[in-house]
């Protein structure tokens, strides 16, 4: 009979199937809407009425049988695929693991943290302040007159007439003196901004500025502090000298050089005794209190410490350069 022929063909083909694509082709050929088993049901109209029930029953039994065999084959193929996937995912624990490249601190950050540790060990507090400053905190309170070139738009990043990106961290000293009574000893690390960009200048760089206010402080205290810093930062052989200079907020003012073996004398920072006008601006009595201040560019210190010639290397994000320090 035709039913037995379809059954034999289906079972034979199903036994040879080995992948999902062949299984889908089988389903369409035998179990689909236009498949061979569905086609058997179309023969009902050609049979005598009394034979139709038995014939229909036989066709339905065949469909159920083939569907069961089909599902078993599908599960068998699925198990094989899962096993193959597991084999591919198998981990050989004897194979050496891949070495991860660990990140580390940027050389500028490393130097800034070292500067902080040195001054904290000498009794200074670390104080921070806003990077957007008023012109009063950034210039006026620091005895910087309106005609001073540092206040020009060509040198500073103004946001409004009264607000700008701070050009140094000295405003933190002003804010601290307004909030605290002397004596105080602080350093203020952070980002500062100036319109300058070349091999030795960046428009955004880092500074650490220091302030010590107490009774009877002198240039001798300032020099001792800077000598101790240089010795700890650059080694026991480092020497310090002070050259006369001018800053609006200190009087007297000095450029500070450090002597490094193999390099000679190199300028590293500016310093001086706090100008009495600055004390008056924050409500300190200059007849009672004296103080010294200093400020250094962290990138400058890092360049000297690591022998880096171009300051722009710090912001080029070259992993080969950064991983060397």
Curated annotation (Swiss-Prot):
Keywords: Aminoacyl-tRNA synthetase, ATP-binding, Cytoplasm, Ligase, Magnesium, Metal-binding, Nucleotide-binding, Protein biosynthesis. One of its GO terms (molecular function) is ATP binding. Mg(2+) binds at residue 251. It holds the Pfam family tRNA-synt_2d. It is found in: Cytoplasm. Its main location: cytoplasm. The keyword Oxidoreductase does not apply. Binds 2 magnesium ions per tetramer. CDD domains: PheRS_alpha_core. The keyword Cytoplasm applies. It comes from the Bacteria. It is an enzyme of class 6 (ligase). Its cofactor is Mg(2+). GO terms for biological process: phenylalanyl-tRNA aminoacylation. Its EC number is 6.1.1.20. GO terms for cellular component: cytoplasm. It catalyses: tRNA(Phe) + L-phenylalanine + ATP = L-phenylalanyl-tRNA(Phe) + AMP + diphosphate + H(+). Belongs to the class-II aminoacyl-tRNA synthetase family. Phe-tRNA synthetase alpha subunit type 1 subfamily. Tetramer of two alpha and two beta subunits. This is Phenylalanine--tRNA ligase alpha subunit. It comes from Thermotoga maritima (strain ATCC 43589 / DSM 3109 / JCM 10099 / NBRC 100826 / MSB8).
